C-alpha cells in the first residue's frame, strides 16, 4: 500500500505551479517516504502525484475504480471536487503578475480582489481562478460550489447496500463559512459523479436534522462517521 498526503499552498504565490517547491501538491509515497514508481508529475520531486492545488481537505478512492477524488477549499469562490489524474494540474496559480494580474499583497493574489459584500462570485473567480484554463494539463473539477467557498472538508465514498440509491456516492462535509454575502451551509453533500469524473449527475444534501461544521468523514463497515 501507499500513503497519499495532501498539502496546501502555504500562502506562497509561486508554490502551486513551481517545479521545485513541495506545496500545493498531493503526494503518493511508500512507508519509507519514497516516491511511488509510477508517479508522473512534471516535478523535480518524484513523490508528487498531482500539483497546482490550493487547499485539499479531503481525499478518498472510488471503490469501483480505485480512482482518487479530492475535496478542496476555494479562496472566496469555488470549492471543488476533482478526480485526480496522475501528473495532473489542479490549476491554482495565485502568483502575482500572471494571468493579467498586477502586484498583490505578500506576492499572493489568492484573496484578490478583497472580499466585499455583494460582489458577484463569477467576477471574483475570474481574477484568480481555482481551475485556470490556461493550463493544458488542467484536471477539470467534477463539481464546484456555484462560485462560493463554504469550506469543503473531509470526503468519503458511501459503501454498503444500506445506503440504497446513495451507495457509491462521494460524501463531503461542508463547514459553512458565511461572510461577505456567502450563504452558510453547514451540511454533508452527496455527489453522484459521472464515470469519467468530469461532472456530476446530482448533488443531494444529507438530511441530518442538524447543522454542524463537519470536519472529518470516514466510512467503516457501511456506517459513516462524521466529526465536528
Predicted regions and their residues:
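Repeated scaffold domains used in trafficking and secretory/extracellular systems
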Residues: 213-215
Amino acid at each position: 500500500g501507499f500513503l497519499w498526503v495532501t498539502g496546501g499552498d502555504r500562502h506562497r504565490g509561486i508554490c502551486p505551479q513551481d517545479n521545485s517547491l513541495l506545496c500545493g501538491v498531493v503526494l503518493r509515497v511508500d512507508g519509507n517516504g519514497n516516491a511511488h514508481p509510477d508517479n508522473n508529475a512534471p516535478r523535480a520531486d518524484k513523490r508528487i502525484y498531482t500539483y497546482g492545488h490550493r487547499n485539499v481537505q479531503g481525499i478518498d478512492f472510488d471503490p469501483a475504480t480505485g480512482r482518487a477524488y479530492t475535496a478542496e477549499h476555494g479562496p472566496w469562490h469555488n470549492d471543488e471536487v476533482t478526480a485526480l489524474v496522475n501528473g495532473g494540474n489542479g490549476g491554482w496559480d495565485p502568483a502575482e503578475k500572471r494571468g493579467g494580474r498586477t502586484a498583490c499583497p505578500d506576492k499572493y493574489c489568492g484573496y484578490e480582489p478583497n472580499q466585499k459584500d455583494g460582489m458577484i462570485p463569477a467576477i471574483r473567480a475570474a481574477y484568480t481562478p481555482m481551475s485556470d484554463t490556461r493550463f493544458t494539463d488542467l484536471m477539470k473539477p467534477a463539481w464546484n460550489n456555484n462560485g462560493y467557498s463554504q469550506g469543503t472538508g473531509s470526503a468519503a465514498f458511501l459503501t454498503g447496500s444500506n445506503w440504497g440509491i446513495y451507495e457509491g456516492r462521494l460524501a463531503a462535509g461542508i463547514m459553512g463559512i458565511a461572510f461577505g454575502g456567502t450563504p452558510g451551509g453547514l451540511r454533508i453533500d452527496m455527489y453522484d459523479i459521472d464515470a469519467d469524473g468530469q461532472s456530476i449527475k446530482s448533488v443531494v444534501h444529507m438530511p441530518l436534522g442538524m447543522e454542524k461544521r463537519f470536519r472529518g468523514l470516514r466510512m467503516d463497515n457501511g456506517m459513516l462517521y462524521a466529526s465536528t
